[in-house]
């Protein structure tokens, strides 16, 4: 996870220069939390919606022991809805309106019923049969229903990217090899011809229409340097590839990329594999398909060469993306 030390002395705390008691956060009373900020932070309140900051009843938590959060009876919360039915690996869970919620009069829904349907076609059929009110679609389904008046396209804000493990694989630390890889990727083809689900090619580190700068313009409009290195340019790819081969003293390269066992990531990975191996002679990319949980764990442990992964925004500020690239 990536965050920013917006609380008073937060940076010093992260660097272990000060104790937790100096963080700048005080419990005024049982229902009031005071946070002192270093600078004005427009997105601070939205940070408080993040699960990391949910209040926890210590007495209840300790009474549940290892079973905390594993069933409806071991979950205690103060939100707009109350979890009434849930079991691990359940195919459905239910929430009902919390009558004690401080703003209950403004909550229009009486409850929410979630159905866990792993097969995307079955999920669409359940929607069409009236069993679901909302469902997510894959690219093929979007093609089928895009003219339906009930179809709505909403940007999720996820940024998919290829992560090279430069610490474990010395060749990937070579700048020219990485430049060869990025110029060999046709992002427009991936989104328009493969995904076909409304996804946009990523030419900026912060997606368009996510945030505005101080002058009111779209923040992504100024990310020209990032866009420059995301352009599909086979000639530049070949040029950087030759430089990389000369610097590394190798004519061929072989890497393995870990990929989620879901439909869309696998399709993208196959196209990435084809584009790289076609544009860069002697470049081999093997695909290792894993359940998402295992893929994430392997990448966290450094047990990978290249990973196809994604990042979604945690709060409404460009640093939710840019913070990933800050070192030190």
Q: Could you tell me what each predicted segment is?
A:
Residues 201-243, 264-266:
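Structural transition elements
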Residues 7, 11-22, 31, 37-107, ...:
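Gly/Pro-rich hinge or "lid" segments in bacterial periplasmic/extracellular proteins
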Residues 99-144:
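Ligand-site clamp/hinge motif
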Residues 77, 105-110, 175, 234-256:
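Immediate post-signal peptide segment of exported/extracytoplasmic ligand-binding proteins
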Residues 30-36, 79-80, 109-111, 158-211, ...:
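Alpha-helical secondary-structure segments
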Residues 1-6, 294-328:
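Acidic-aromatic pocket-rim loops
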Residues 88-90, 238, 242-313:
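Ligand/substrate-recognition segments at binding pockets and active sites
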Residues 136-148, 313-318:
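A ligand-binding cleft/hinge motif common to bilobed small-molecule-binding domains
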């Amino acid at each position: 996870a990536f965050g920013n030390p917006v609380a008073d002395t937060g940076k010093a705390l992260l660097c272990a220069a000060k104790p937790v008691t100096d963080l700048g956060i005080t419990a005024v009373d049982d229902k009031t939390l005071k946070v002192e900020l270093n600078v004005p932070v427009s997105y601070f309140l939205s940070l408080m919606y993040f699960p990391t900051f949910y209040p926890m009843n210590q007495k209840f938590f300790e009474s549940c022991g290892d079973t905390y959060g594993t069933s409806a009876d071991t979950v205690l919360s103060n939100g707009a809805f109350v979890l009434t039915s849930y079991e691990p690996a359940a195919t459905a869970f239910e929430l009902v309106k919390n009558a004690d919620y401080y703003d209950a009069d403004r909550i229009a829904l009486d409850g929410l019923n979630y159905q866990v349907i792993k097969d995307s076609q079955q999920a669409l059929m359940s929607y069409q049969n009236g069993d679901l009110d909302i469902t997510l679609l894959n690219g093929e389904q979007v093609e089928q229903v895009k003219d339906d008046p009930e179809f709505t396209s909403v940007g999720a804000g996820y940024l998919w990217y290829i992560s090279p493990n430069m610490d474990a694989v010395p060749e990937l630390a070579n700048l020219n090899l990485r430049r060869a890889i990025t110029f060999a990727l046709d992002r427009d083809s991936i989104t328009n011809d493969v995904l076909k689900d409304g996804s946009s090619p990523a030419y900026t580190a912060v997606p368009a229409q996510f945030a505005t700068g101080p002058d009111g313009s779209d923040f992504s409009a100024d990310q020209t340097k990032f866009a420059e290195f995301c352009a599909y340019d086979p000639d530049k790819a070949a040029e950087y590839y030759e430089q990389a081969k000369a610097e590394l003293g190798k004519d061929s390269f072989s890497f393995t990329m870990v990929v989620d066992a879901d439909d869309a990531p696998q399709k993208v990975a196959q196209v990435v594999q084809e584009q790289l191996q076609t544009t860069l002679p002697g470049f081999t990319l093997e695909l290792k398909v894993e359940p998402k949980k295992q893929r994430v764990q392997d990448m966290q442990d450094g047990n990978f060469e290249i990973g196809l992964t994604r990042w979604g925004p945690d709060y409404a500020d460009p640093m939710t993306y840019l913070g990933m690239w800050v070192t030190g």
